[in-house]
């Protein structure tokens, strides 16, 4: 028996619109089953997509996509959208090398109206499209679909503020599941999920107390009264929820509709048809459940936000085998260092912009809850907030991904560096990140950090050096950033101490002849592998700023040529810093600069991506040998 007779008919939204509305609930079930199977094979974002199935079907059923524009915020919930827009048979390639991207991507499909990956951009982008359509005299509709987690970011409110004052036809769908990746924080989620009216609860309690004894004596009366009580509570909650939400968004100039059940697809279709006919800014408040339809994800949406594979819901836990201990990830090394340091220093505080699990802060929050601050998806605020803490003598550590640190660049300069405030940035996911692709790659931090005055920039080559540099930069009386990659370390033993190294000094990892490899961070390991074959010297620079000028000059004068290696953009990166030192000292030597060229990277297996970029050990060897051969031929 065909498990998906309706879904098999759909290769585009045009096919979807041929279905009767009464068939849509069945289609939703088939689509959810397909998601379970496809994500179970490929991994990827999971719980968010399960929660957006009915909403996605309804949007494509009502709106004339791709003529009408759907802009998905972040893109975590875009898999059903991809399935319904002609990519169903490619879902087995999701996030794989050469396959479908894990986020909407304009070059992948005409249905992907705007490329995303970071949060809170959808309203601004959809507003721009609506404004353009008005200028062009088009009657197309633009829709922004944004989660309540993304609504905690200032950019979303900037767009709401602007949209409410513009005469454009825009729909904002607020997908309210009370989650971002972790549970939401801040006043806005509490506002959206406000409790029932207190007076109603008080009244119900009084009635129960005064009538309970009587009702107990009447058969079935107490059960009936409990049902009435539950219904009154539910109505009170919905009324209060709607009243408060309406007040907020209508004050922004939007006409508010909701909240509505985001899993009742037939009702969603009716509501969206009505909204599509309206003029001006509209906001639809939809209530969904993250992980809907898969009990494990419903019960633990944080764990199942993104998965590598899926266990069977009924599968028994298998006894663990005696396996060798896995190498720790850099994130784990940071998390342990942070807890160790906090236990010894009561001034240490940790800040994260809604990335508790990803940044390794779960244990810290449990052990030091008063010194843990999750500020929501608000990177700009996170940095300035850290500056305020530093002004009062605290020792802030901002745990943040490299790609998200980009969103707070002005705050880095204006609020931290210009005031020389001692804030430590633990910059995770530096370099290639793999399946999440270019929107999440950390390829620019060395370039944009090293030009900031007062900033110390460090790049460890292994997990023990990561701990050393974290301890060193924490004790520096200046702003500092330690950038480290995603994934496991090299397997070296990690100290439990708080040893430090001299700021701005590198070390020689291997002595060789003629060719000197000046390597930074994750590129030290491939440099060592290639140096063994070429008998080259390898310097682990440790710091990009201040850079070890003395070591660079010594290597340049004692070797015939230099190769710089970094997992960062070549423009403005660490290799450029080496060239600046050579120019400053009047040294003219052949230099091969190896980094990420001026290109947008792909997604998939990090090893394949590094090979494509010429930064795997094998690729570095090929490039260096070719460079040496060309130089020999030229001479």
From Swiss-Prot:
Q: Does the keyword Transferase apply?
A: yes
Enzyme Commission code:
2.2.1.7
Q: Which GO terms describe its cellular component?
A: cytosol
PROSITE patterns per UniProt = TRANSKETOLASE_1, TRANSKETOLASE_2
Q: In which pathway does it act?
A: Metabolic intermediate biosynthesis; 1-deoxy-D-xylulose 5-phosphate biosynthesis; 1-deoxy-D-xylulose 5-phosphate from D-glyceraldehyde 3-phosphate and pyruvate: step 1/1
Q: What reaction does this catalyse? A: D-glyceraldehyde 3-phosphate + pyruvate + H(+) = 1-deoxy-D-xylulose 5-phosphate + CO2
> Which keywords belong to this entry?
Isoprene biosynthesis, Magnesium, Metal-binding, Thiamine biosynthesis, Thiamine pyrophosphate, Transferase
Enzyme's top EC category: transferase
Alphabetized GO MF terms: 1-deoxy-D-xylulose-5-phosphate synthase activity; magnesium ion binding; thiamine pyrophosphate binding
- What does the record note on quaternary structure? Homodimer.
Q: Which family does the UniProt entry place this protein in?
A: Belongs to the transketolase family. DXPS subfamily.
Q: What is this protein called?
A: 1-deoxy-D-xylulose-5-phosphate synthase
**UniProt source species:** Neisseria meningitidis serogroup C (strain 053442)
Species classification: Bacteria, Pseudomonadati, Pseudomonadota, Betaproteobacteria, Neisseriales
- Its gene? dxs
């Amino acid at each position: 028996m065909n498990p998906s007779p309706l879904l098999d008919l759909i290769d585009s939204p045009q096919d979807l619109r041929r279905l009767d509305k009464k068939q849509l609930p069945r289609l939703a079930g088939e689509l959810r089953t397909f998601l379970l199977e496809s994500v179970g094979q490929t991994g990827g974002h999971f719980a968010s997509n399960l929660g957006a199935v009915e909403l996605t079907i309804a949007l494509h059923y009502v709106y004339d996509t791709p003529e009408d524009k759907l802009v998905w915020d972040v893109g975590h919930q875009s898999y059903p959208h991809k399935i319904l827009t002609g990519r169903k048979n490619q879902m087995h390639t999701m996030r794989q090398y050469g396959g479908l991207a894990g986020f909407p991507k304009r070059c992948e499909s005409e249905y992907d109206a705007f490329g995303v990956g970071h949060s809170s951009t959808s309203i601004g982008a959809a507003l721009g499209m609506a404004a353009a359509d008005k200028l062009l005299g088009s009657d197309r509709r633009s829709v922004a679909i944004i989660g309540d987690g993304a609504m905690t970011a200032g950019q979303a409110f900037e767009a709401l503020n602007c949209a409410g004052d513009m005469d454009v036809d825009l729909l904002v769908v607020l997908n309210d599941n009370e989650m971002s990746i972790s549970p939401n924080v801040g006043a806005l989620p509490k506002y959206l999920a406000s409790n029932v009216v207190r007076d109603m609860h008080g009244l119900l309690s009084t009635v129960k107390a005064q009538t309970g004894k009587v009702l107990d004596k009447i058969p079935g009366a107490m059960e009936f009264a409990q049902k009435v009580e539950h219904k009154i509570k539910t109505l009170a909650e919905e009324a209060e929820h709607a009243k408060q939400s309406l007040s907020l968004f209508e004050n922004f100039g939007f006409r508010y509709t909701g909240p509505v059940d985001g899993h009742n697809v037939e009702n969603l279709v009716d509501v969206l048809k009505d909204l599509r006919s309206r003029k001006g800014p509209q906001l639809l408040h939809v209530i969904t459940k993250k992980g809907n339809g898969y009990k494990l994800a419903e019960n633990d949406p944080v764990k199942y936000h993104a998965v590598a594979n899926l266990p069977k819901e009924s599968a028994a836990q298998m006894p663990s085998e005696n396996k060798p201990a896995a190498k720790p990830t850099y994130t784990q090394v940071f998390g342990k260092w942070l807890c160790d340091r906090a236990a010894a220093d009561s001034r240490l505080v940790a800040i994260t912009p809604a990335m508790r699990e990803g940044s390794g802060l779960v244990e810290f929050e449990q052990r030091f809850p008063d010194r843990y601050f999750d500020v929501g998806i608000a990177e700009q605020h996170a940095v300035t907030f850290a500056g305020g803490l530093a002004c009062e003598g605290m020792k802030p550590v901002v745990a943040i991904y490299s790609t998200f640190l980009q969103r707070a660049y002005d705050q880095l300069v204006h609020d931290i560096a210009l005031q020389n405030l001692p804030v430590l940035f633990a910059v995770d996911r530096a370099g290639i990140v793999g399946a999440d692709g270019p929107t999440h790659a950390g390829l620019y931090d060395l370039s944009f950090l090293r030009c900031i005055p007062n900033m110390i920039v460090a790049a460890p080559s292994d997990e023990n050096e990561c701990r050393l540099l974290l301890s060193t930069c924490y004790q520096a009386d200046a702003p500092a950033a330690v950038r480290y990659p995603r994934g496991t370390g090299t397997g070296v033993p990690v100290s439990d101490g708080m040893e430090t190294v001299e700021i701005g000094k590198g070390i020689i990892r291997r002595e060789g002849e003629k060719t000197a490899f000046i390597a930074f961070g994750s590129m030290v390991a491939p440099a060592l592998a290639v140096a063994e074959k070429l008998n080259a010297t390898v310097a682990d620079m440790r710091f990009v700023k201040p850079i070890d000028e003395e070591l660079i000059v010594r290597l340049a004068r004692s070797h015939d040529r230099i190769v710089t290696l970094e997992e960062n953009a070549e423009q403005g990166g660490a290799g450029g810093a080496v060239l600046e030192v050579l120019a400053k000292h009047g040294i003219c030597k052949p230099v091969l600069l190896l980094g990420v060229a001026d290109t947008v990277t792909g997604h998939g297996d990090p090893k394949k991506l590094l090979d494509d970029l010429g930064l795997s050990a094998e690729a570095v060897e090929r490039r260096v040998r070719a460079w040496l051969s060309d130089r020999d031929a030229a001479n």
